[in-house]
Amino acid sequence: LFPRIREITDAFGGRLQVSVEEHPSGALVVLERPDITGRPRILLDGYGVDVLSGYIMSARLAVPHELPDEHIDGMFATRFRLGLDPCAVLALHQASGPALDIPAPFWDRLYAELCLVAAHARELGRRAEARVH
């Protein structure tokens, strides 16, 4: 069952991979743009997935207006930013590499996919806890 990998595409050939991988803490969600040179990628734990899901919805409601950045800390510290010029894009920044840009055409499908992967990640976390006890 794991790793679980799904690919979202847009009408222009853009690609966004969303995967769930086992991790000692339970699970990680990996977002990657294989269509972009350097294949930018972001690793998120459950907290990061929850914040990203909320930020996607907030961005949808905010466009064409600005939205304050969101920051999460911890092992997978990330900054979420809404860019508006020249088009709406979510930029995810981690210290370990280049920003991962997610254009607006991906947002709805990514939100739906994050709902699914969050459930898988919680289950992997539950299994990891059961192994420890």
Per-region residue spans from a language model:
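Positively charged, low-complexity terminal tracts
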Residues: 1-133
